[in-house]
């Protein structure tokens, strides 16, 4: 199997939904199904923070979400945990700068999707040189979902990466809503990653569908 083509990766990033059980008010499996019905293009399992599942419960929950993704042919990515990604035969993994080194991750994951969070041009170049398939850039806007975020980059921060020749697929992260999603694409991102704007929406289906419309218009 060869690594994913750039054009295909770019398409998958369009509406990238990230969720764990503690990101929902409603049943997470219901939220997930609604989001898939609404047209999300990629999913990341991120079971972290207060109230998150651990141990075997976490693994079983991941398997349930993965089964839904397979049903809809939406790739299933695991946040940070390479061992879990391998155990589940996930489609890929997303790592931050504080996680296991990108070189080691690429070696372990083979040709599967590897995404890396980058906050500087140097981090971006290092990730690309060591096998990243896409970069997560952000936070673009202020966010309350993640407690350990870096300084807000803004749309100008996103543009800066493109101006400096970073040409692999990029997904914007942080504080992205239906109202500002199109501006993230215009600033140079291939897609938007979303947690609460879908997971906490009164209708995850309607929200996901609206994001698809904003990103693809």
Swiss-Prot record:
GO cellular component, one term: cytoplasm
Pathway noted in the entry: Cofactor biosynthesis; thiamine diphosphate biosynthesis; thiamine phosphate from 4-amino-2-methyl-5-diphosphomethylpyrimidine and 4-methyl-5-(2-phosphoethyl)-thiazole: step 1/1
Cofactor: Mg(2+)
Residues holding 2-[(2R,5Z)-2-carboxy-4-methylthiazol-5(2H)-ylidene]ethyl phosphate: 143-145, 175, 195-196
Cofactor note: Binds 1 Mg(2+) ion per subunit.
Binding-site residues, Mg(2+): 80, 99
Keyword Transferase among UniProt keywords: yes
Cross-referenced CDD domains: TMP_TenI (cd00564)
Transferase listed as a keyword: yes
EC number: 2.5.1.3
Family statement drawn from the similarity comment of this UniProt entry: Belongs to the thiamine-phosphate synthase family.
Name assigned to this protein: Thiamine-phosphate synthase
Lineage of producing organism: Bacteria, Bacillati, Bacillota, Bacilli, Bacillales
């Amino acid at each position: 199997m060869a690594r994913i083509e750039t054009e295909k990766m770019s398409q998958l990033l369009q509406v990238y939904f990230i969720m764990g059980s503690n990101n929902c008010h409603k049943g997470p499996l219901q939220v997930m199904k609604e989001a898939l019905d609404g047209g999300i293009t990629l999913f990341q399992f991120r079971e972290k923070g207060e109230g998150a599942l651990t141990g075997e419960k976490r693994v079983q929950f991941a398997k349930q979400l993965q089964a839904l993704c397979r049903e809809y042919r939406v790739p299933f990515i695991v946040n940070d945990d390479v061992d879990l990604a391998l155990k589940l035969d996930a489609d890929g993994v997303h790592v931050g700068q504080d996680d296991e080194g990108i070189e080691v991750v690429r070696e372990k994951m083979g040709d599967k999707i590897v995404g890396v969070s980058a906050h500087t041009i140097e981090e971006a170049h290092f990730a690309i040189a060591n096998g990243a398939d896409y970069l997560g850039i952000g936070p673009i806007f202020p966010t309350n979902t993640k407690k350990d975020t870096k300084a807000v980059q803004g749309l100008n921060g996103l543009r800066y990466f493109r101006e400096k020749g970073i040409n692999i697929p990029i997904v914007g992260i942080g504080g992205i809503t239906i109202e500002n999603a199109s501006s993230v694409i215009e600033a140079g991102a291939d897609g938007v990653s979303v947690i609460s704007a879908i997971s906490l929406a009164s209708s995850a289906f309607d929200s996901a569908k609206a994001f698809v419309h904003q990103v693809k218009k």
